[in-house]
A protein has these predicted regions:
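Glycine-rich phosphate/diphosphate-binding loops that line cofactor/substrate pockets in enzymes
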Residues: 115-130, 191-199, 275-289, 374-384
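Short alpha-helices
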Residues: 235-236, 242-272, 302-303, 308, ...
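A generic structural motif
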Residues: 156-168, 226-236, 314-328, 409-422
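A cross-kingdom feature strongest in bacterial/archaeal respiratory oxidoreductases
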Residues: 147, 190, 197-203, 209-239, ...
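A polyampholytic, Gly/Pro-enriched intrinsically disordered region
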Residues: 175-199, 251-259, 266-275, 334-352, ...
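A glycine-rich, hydrophobic/aromatic-adjacent loop/helix-cap motif
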Residues: 289-373
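A glycine-rich phosphate-binding loop feature that marks nucleotide/adenosyl-phosphate handling sites
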Residues: 31-38, 136-137, 166, 308, ...
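N-terminal export/assembly segments and adjacent metallocofactor-ligating motifs
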Residues: 1-268, 568, 572-575, 595, ...
Length: 650
């Protein structure tokens, strides 16, 4: 009503559609006139939606970002994160020159040749015992360069882009169902249009408004225009689900597998009734869709059950990750089990095809380590070196363990935009280009290639632009090849072959899509769900669209629109705990406590929901607990006085 705050993740669209220019943003107001700007078409880097944008810049500085009109993707809309979240690249702490740790243990500026030689010495000595953490924000071309660098230069399949909760089951699922499939890959796969036309949609491990706003807009539009039915397996009905007219299928963490198997079975034999029965029947209608998000990887058997449900009901299955680079990283081969194009890393013919294009005799044939295993091996000394690109330690499943591994590993190379927990521990740091400063491709959740050119060109800049990740890896590989002591007998090619974007795309085209046998289906089973005792609850949570993420830094006005961080309990659990709506609730794990105001919510009992990155250093880092594990809950003053941490039971 009148006087109420305007709370929307899409508020910036009112500025763009204002016919007289009376509405402006705090970030752009009085800073430039439209005729002073150069406009460049671009693609948003903040989620897997692949939204078309227009970047307006002047004198080498981005001034504003607008939605571009793309009827097949984002139509003419853009979320506020995509519109205003570009100032992270303008922060004064941007890395502009390489850094090398000196004999006194201090990082100091170095020339590019000095830094490349230092990195080559360290990585060359660790060849065969090095791992790569590529992160989920890379373009397809950069992710491909990391995949090739790991196999050809470092001699390992120990590479993973998943800087988040992950599992072997998820890797198998991606290899079997996602790699090689998509709109621009094999002509198959779901699109925004087919999703909008679906009669029913089931969401599992996925919250559309928070994790893929463009998808949310299509679901909301389909509900309002066509009566589309959306069902969500989640602890509570989110704002996005309610605005899309959705129905909650209440699922405590870990029960998603049971729900999916029940929906796949005959509704009568499965004992479903009410909303569950209606969801099961709706999924059997032609064109129905099951959407799984990256968080389902935290649920043993969840992705396996989703695939079974899709087969049993005839529904289409689609995976929508949270970060912009994850879908492309699958195709690029930045996984321990996959080579580019969806080729299984353990398939001899797949390795031969790839080795021939890469100009090497052979490739590593063992199944590589995933992110968690790479970190563990670095901590124990099994791995002697790490190459880390754009990974935030707090995003990892075990931030404390990751910090210990980074401290313990013998040699650490970081490729980054700005100082981070990784760069402060690195032996060599290379600055790399931000999205506005390079050309590339994001592969969105549809499998649609979203190519873009650099908005900021070298001739427009007053400072030297950092190179793209792929260019840094090319220079590093060539430096390694020129270091005989490091590569003797290793078969490292004299030319890495990726000096520029055209060379990368040419290699990707030569490799094409794998036409051989697909990877085997995941066969993971569900596991017993933790049973909370007195004063305990199962932790649930997801990240909000606007939170403490590093790519949102630099715009105080955007930060001011974040939703308030609250903890959620059911009315029954709140009464058992001795708290009421608005009270401060403390949630304690093995490493510490998070305290937030309570919002009593309709949700399963003995479950506590927290926003994962909206307070402190993030829930995973501050508590040492991850969703699906047990935590202790209580009134803030009582819990703050307690010193005993709970035993964490998976």
């Amino acid at each position: 009503g009148e006087g109420d705050p305007f709370e929307s993740y899409f508020s910036g669209n009112t500025i763009q559609i204002c016919p007289v220019g009376a509405l402006t943003s705090a970030a752009y107001r009085f800073r430039s006139r439209p005729f002073d700007l150069v406009s460049s078409p671009s693609v948003c880097e903040h989620c897997a939606g692949g939204c078309a944008t227009r970047t307006d810049h002047r004198r080498g500085k981005v001034m504003r970002r607008l939605a571009a009109n793309d009827p097949e993707v984002n139509e003419e809309w853009l979320c506020d994160k995509g519109r205003f979240g570009f100032r992270y690249a303008q922060k004064p702490d941007r890395l502009t020159t390489p850094l090398v740790r000196n004999e006194d243990g201090v990082l100091e500026p170095a020339s590019w040749p000095e830094a490349l030689e230092a990195a080559a010495r360290g990585l060359g000595a660790a060849r065969g015992r090095a791992g790569v953490l590529a992160g989920g924000r890379l373009t397809v071309e950069d992710a491909y360069a990391y995949a090739k660098f790991a196999r050809v230069v470092l001699g390992t399949n120990d590479i993973d882009f998943r800087a988040r909760v992950h599992s072997t089951e998820e890797a198998d699922f991606l290899a079997a169902h996602i790699a090689g499939h998509g709109r621009d890959l094999d002509g198959t796969g779901l699109t925004y249009t087919t999703l909008e036309k679906a009669p029913a949609v089931l969401l599992a491990g996925f919250e559309s408004e928070e994790e893929a706003p463009g998808v949310f807009l299509r679901l909301r539009k389909a509900h309002r225009n066509r009566g589309q039915r959306t069902f969500s397996l989640a602890p509570y009905a989110t704002r996005g689900l309610e605005k899309a007219g959705g129905t909650l299928l209440p699922a405590a963490p870990g029960t998603e597998t049971e729900w999916l198997d029940a929906l796949a079975a005959n509704p009568v034999s499965a004992g479903l009734e009410g909303d569950g029965e209606r969801a099961s029947q709706a999924l059997r209608e032609p064109g129905a869709v099951i959407v799984v998000g990256e968080r389902l990887a935290a649920v043993p058997g969840g992705l396996t059950a989703a695939a079974r449900a899709a087969t049993a009901t005839g529904a289409k299955l689609v995976w929508i990750p949270r970060r912009a680079g994850e879908r492309g990283a699958v195709e690029a081969g930045a996984l321990p089990s996959l080579l580019p194009g969806g080729r299984p890393a353990t398939d001899p013919r797949a390795r031969e095809e790839t080795a021939a294009v890469w100009g090497v005799r052979e490739l590593p044939h063992h199944y590589g380590r995933d992110t968690g295993q790479i970190i563990e091996a670095a901590a124990t000394g099994e791995l002697a070196a790490l190459v880390v690109a754009g990974v935030e330690v707090a995003d990892l499943p075990d931030p404390a363990g990751a910090r210990a591994a980074l401290d313990a590993v013998g040699f650490l190379v970081s490729l980054e935009l700005r100082p981070s927990e990784v760069t402060e521990r690195a032996d060599v740091v290379f600055p790399v280009a931000a999205v506005a400063e390079k050309s590339g491709t994001f592969l969105n959740w549809e499998g649609r290639a979203r190519m873009f050119e650099a908005a900021l060109k070298p001739e427009q800049m007053t400072r030297r632009l950092a190179p793209a990740d792929a260019r840094v890896l090319h220079m590093l590989a060539d430096t390694l090849a020129a270091t005989p002591a490091a590569t003797e007998g290793a078969g490292v090619p004299g030319d890495f072959g990726l000096p520029d974007l055209r060379a990368v795309r040419t290699e990707l085209d030569r490799l094409g899509r794998w036409e051989g046998p697909r990877a085997t289906e995941p066969l993971e089973s569900s596991r017993p769900v933790p049973r909370p005792g007195d004063g305990e609850a199962v932790l649930a949570g997801h990240r909000l669209l606007l939170d403490l993420g590093r790519l949102q830094e630099g715009d105080d006005a955007l930060a001011g629109t974040r939703h308030a961080a609250v903890a959620r309990l059911s009315a029954v659990t709140a009464a058992e705990t001795g708290v009421k709506d608005g009270d401060e609730l403390s949630v304690t794990g093995p490493l510490g406590t998070v305290t937030l105001p309570l919002q009593v919510t309709r949700m399963p009992d003995r479950v506590v929901w927290l926003p994962l990155n909206s307070t402190g250093g993030g829930v995973l880092a501050d508590t040492g607990s991850r969703p699906g594990t047990l935590v202790r809950i209580g009134p803030a003053e009582a819990r703050d006085a307690a010193t005993e941490a709970p035993e964490v039971r998976a």
